[in-house]
């Protein structure tokens, strides 16, 4: 088994690092790329239908020389993939890339620095490094270097295997660290931690360069290559370093990208996220005023604090598996691990690999014209409380629209367009007059003679995910049937389950991110007609469901023109079953009866309705499937995307006690104080299950409790960015019109400086 862990271009060479039969290797490969040019006699065909012929380059630099020779015109007309790393990987691994997660060295790191003058700036790296802790998944040992005393016998982390090296000074500490990091045994393939990309790694690189010179700092790269990057996030420019040969997968970034099942957070500090995910905290040092006091007065606890941070990262990965997920996605796309944190790069590689294996050449890449186009349809809700609400959801709306209408850049019919929009479609005033094409709701036609590249990949991914999920379920059943005392077999099965889970989750995430890539004007396959076609067709499809639902409900309930659809949100409809329940359902049987009506009448009606839509647009293949989601005895809407449902049954799962589904309400917003969120959730249960008197009593009780809480417990969690935009050095501290939370941050910084407290408290940036 051979696979890569990092591939980079250096001049005319490809620096290739990976594993072969369980052993790490590093190789420097001379690589000559292949690109293509238009040629009416060419033997190859590009995705856009052009005939092309290959241009074989001896080295990568020749491509740029050719572009300069033709003054940039040649670059625009050159077909093929100019991402040479991806091209190299496609040639090296044209098929599915298998990998062994267990041999890949994933190293977690955390550093501590002197903070007697306040929080240190990584770009300046003026303060000494006081402790470094590293732990890899290969030997499971926590390696720690520091100049203070620490005893293994006195640690509170006795369950961990710690190797502590006491150093005489910072120089020795950093020399030992570099020796460990750069050794063939311990050099990482992946380095992770919490905010390591913008703090730990740049601080180490800058500090080592300051003390020993840049050549020593470059030893952090197995190739001796480190490149500085300037990255602007939230209006603030930050320094990062690309360590050639080693992937940086900052767990903070991974959590923000893939940890969406936990929802938005009031804070993204490690202490808070560890509490949310693991119900654990960082090691508390509340008995000391700050980290510097802890370092000076309790060295034992200071090192324990350092080790604990690394352990928390390790435990987050054990539970969430986000690094394994990123690796799985990277090998699926044939890209470097860090490319999974974006959207367009991985999809560009996925499509390139698929087309290359079919002998189709990718078109040139370049910025396209992009005008504004409509998004998903959100219906203004019927505000207030509703009895017996049932929700229905279209399965993967946008990917399935792409498949049903065969939408892809190469299937767009050039020069053909009709006056079509969602309103015309819903009135059924216009039928597709070109049966050889599929008509989208923006009036664009798509060819049907063969499946487009985007629909093909979506279908392939869906089919593969279905197979993987079946394997995962089979393994879960195998685990249930296996003797629990057979630990070796249980571990094997759990590893299989984890692998399948990551595979299916990687496919799901990629499918969900495809539309985002298609709407990006820098994406090779961006086409405004396709992007607009997807969203306007999506609006039509969900409003078509609304029309069909209202026709059905008015007929069954013997009403006229009553709107039974309370709300619509892109791919979901929320239907008021209150009249139907009053008219036909026996008390006490509501949930079971609604479930039966949905299964036997509602869903078949929607299936027939979507078959009519399919015929009207002359689609490529039917893919619209609506499923029943929640049955709730009460629902409350306050505005678009803001509601509460008291759910009794969800997707066929019957709850012993109803569960609240809350969307957009302050009770789940990370900007609402935690104490208020908990109180609101409790209050909602009273609202849906009690009466006015009970609600007023609950509010009065909390109001009394609220007045006893500290300012920290009731203040609004708010993030700020680009605060320098509002700052004023003269004529006051902040500009007129400064938002209140930014004003607070500027006032805080002003008083910290005025009182000389920078050493104790970090400024808000």
Locate the predicted segments by residue:
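Active-site-proximal helix-loop-helix substrate-binding element of RNase H-like nuclease domains
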Residues: 142-145, 152-155, 161-164, 168, ...
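Non-transmembrane amphipathic alpha-helical segments
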Residues: 458-479, 507
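Conserved catalytic palm subdomain of right-hand nucleotidyl-transferase polymerases, strongest
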Residues: 109, 249-250, 384-397, 465-468
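Common nucleic-acid-contacting/processivity interface regions adjacent to the catalytic cores
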Residues: 289-409, 415-416, 487-553, 567, ...
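DnaQ-like (DEDDh/DEDDy) 3′-5′ exonuclease domain used for proofreading
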Residues: 1-187, 308, 312-331, 338-375, ...
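Proline-aspartate-enriched helix->loop->beta-strand connector
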Residues: 177-203
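Catalytic palm subdomain of template-directed nucleic-acid polymerases
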Residues: 573-602
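C-terminal, non-catalytic extensions of nucleic-acid polymerases
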Residues: 599, 603-765
């Amino acid at each position: 088994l051979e696979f890569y862990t990092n591939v980079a271009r250096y001049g005319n060479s490809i620096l290739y690092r990976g594993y072969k039969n369980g052993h790490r290797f590093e190789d420097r490969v001379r690589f000559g790329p292949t690109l293509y040019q238009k040629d009416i006699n060419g033997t190859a065909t590009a995705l856009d239908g052009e005939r092309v012929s290959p241009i074989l380059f001896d080295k990568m630099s020749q491509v740029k020389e050719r572009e300069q020779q033709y003054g940039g015109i040649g670059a625009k007309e050159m077909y093929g993939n100019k991402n040479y790393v991806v091209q190299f990987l496609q040639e090296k691994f044209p098929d599915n890339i298998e990998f062994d997660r267990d041999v890949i060295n994933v190293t977690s790191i955390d550093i501590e620095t002197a903070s007697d003058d306040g929080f240190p700036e990584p770009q300046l790296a003026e303060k000494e490094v006081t402790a470094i802790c590293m732990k890899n998944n290969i030997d499971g040992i926590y390696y720690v270097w520091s100049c203070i005393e620490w005893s293994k016998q006195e640690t509170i982390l006795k369950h961990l295997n710690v190797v502590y090296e006491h150093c005489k000074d910072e120089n020795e500490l950093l020399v030992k660290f570099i020796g460990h990091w750069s050794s063939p045994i311990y050099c990482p393939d992946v380095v992770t931690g919490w905010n390591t990309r913008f703090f730990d790694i740049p601080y180490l690189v800058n500090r080592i360069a300051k003390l020993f010179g840049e050549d020593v700092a470059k030893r952090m790269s197995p190739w001796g290559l480190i490149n500085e990057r300037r990255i602007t996030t939230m209006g603030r420019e930050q320094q990062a370093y690309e360590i050639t040969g080693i992937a940086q997968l900052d767990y903070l970034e991974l959590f923000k990208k893939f940890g969406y099942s936990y929802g938005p957070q009031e804070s993204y500090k490690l202490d808070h996220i560890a509490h949310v995910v693991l119900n654990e905290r960082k090691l508390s040092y509340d008995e000391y005023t700050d980290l510097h006091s802890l370092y000076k007065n309790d060295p034992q606890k200071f090192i324990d604090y350092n080790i604990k941070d690394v352990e928390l990262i390790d435990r987050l990965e054990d539970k969430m598996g986000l690094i394994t997920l990123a690796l799985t996605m990277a090998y699926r796309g044939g890209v470097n691990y860090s490319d999974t944190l974006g959207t367009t790069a991985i999809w560009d590689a996925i499509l390139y690999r698929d087309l290359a294996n079919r002998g189709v050449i990718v078109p040139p890449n370049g910025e396209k014209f992009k005008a504004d186009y409509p998004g998903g349809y959100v219906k203004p809700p019927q505000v207030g409380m509703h009895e017996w609400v049932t929700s229905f959801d279209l399965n993967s709306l946008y990917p399935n629209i792409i498949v049903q209408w065969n939408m892809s850049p190469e299937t767009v019919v050039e020069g053909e367009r009709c006056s079509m929009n969602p309103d015309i479609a819903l009135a059924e005033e216009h039928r597709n007059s070109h049966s050889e094409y599929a008509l989208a709701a923006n009036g664009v036609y798509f060819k049907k003679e063969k499946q487009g590249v985007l629909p093909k990949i979506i279908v392939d991914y869906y089919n593969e995910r279905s197979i993987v999920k079946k394997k995962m379920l089979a393994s879960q059943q195998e685990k249930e049937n296996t003797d629990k005392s057979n630990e070796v077999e249980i571990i094997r099965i759990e590893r299989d389950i984890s692998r399948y889970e990551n595979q299916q989750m990687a496919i799901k995430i990629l499918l969900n991110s495809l539309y985002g890539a298609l709407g990006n004007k820098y994406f090779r396959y961006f086409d405004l007609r396709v992007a607009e076609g997807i969203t306007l067709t999506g609006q039509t499809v969900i409003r078509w469901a609304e029309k069909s639902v209202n026709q059905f409900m008015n007929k069954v309930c013997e009403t006229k023109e009553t709107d039974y659809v309370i709300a619509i949100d892109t791919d979901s409809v929320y239907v008021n079953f209150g009249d139907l329940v009053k008219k036909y359902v026996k008390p006490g049987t509501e949930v079971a009866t609604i479930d039966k009506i949905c299964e036997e009448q509602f869903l078949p009606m929607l299936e027939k309705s979507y078959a009519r839509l399919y015929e009207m647009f002359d689609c490529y293949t039917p893919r619209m499937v609506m499923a029943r989601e929640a049955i709730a005895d009460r629902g409350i809407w306050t505005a678009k995307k803001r509601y509460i449902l008291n759910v009794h049954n969800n997707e066929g799962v019957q709850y012993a006690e109803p569960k609240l589904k809350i969307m957009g309400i302050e009770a789940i917003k990370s900007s609402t104080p935690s104490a208020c969120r908990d109180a609101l959730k409790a209050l909602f249960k009273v609202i849906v299950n009690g009466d006015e008197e009970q609600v007023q009593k609950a509010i009065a009780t909390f109001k009394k409790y609220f007045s006893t809480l500290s300012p920290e417990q009731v203040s609004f969690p708010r993030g700020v960015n680009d605060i320098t935009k509002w700052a004023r050095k003269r004529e006051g501290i902040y500009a007129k019109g400064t938002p209140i939370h930014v004003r607070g941050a500027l006032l805080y910084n002003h008083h910290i400086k005025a009182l000389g407290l920078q050493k104790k408290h970090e400024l808000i940036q």
